C-alpha cells in the first residue's frame, strides 16, 4: 500500500484532533478557515471561549517535533488570521479567545496519544 501524501496525512491528523476536542466538549465553529493572512485549522468554542487550534503533524522528530514547528513567524500568522476571523465573524468578537496546539507525531501516530496544549502561546 502506498504511503499517504503529506496533505492526506495532515487532513487525517486534523480529523483526529477535531474528534478528540469534540469529545472533550468543544464545539466546531470553522474548519480550514482561510484568509489573506493565512489559515486557521480549527476554530472551536470551549464554553464561552473562542479557541483557535493549530494542528501539527510530523512523521519524524528529526527536524524537531510537531510542537517545535510553531515558531514566532507561525504564531504571528495565526494571530493575524484570528484577528481577521473575529472581524469577519463579529458576533464572536466580544468573547475571550485563546490559541491551542494539538500535536501528533509518528506513522499513524505510533500509538502515541495526541498532545493538546491549551493557551500554547500568548498574543
UniProtKB/Swiss-Prot annotation:
CDD domains: PoNe_Nuclease
Domain of life: Bacteria
UniProt GO MF annotations: nucleic acid binding
InterPro entries for this protein: Restrct_endonuc-II-like (IPR011335), tRNA_endonuc-like_dom_sf (IPR011856), UPF0102_YraN-like (IPR003509)
Pfam families associated with the record: UPF0102
NCBIfam families registered for this protein in UniProt: PRK12497.1-3, YraN family protein
Family: Belongs to the UPF0102 family.
PANTHER family from the UniProt entry: UPF0102 PROTEIN YRAN
Name of the protein in question: UPF0102 protein Pput_4400
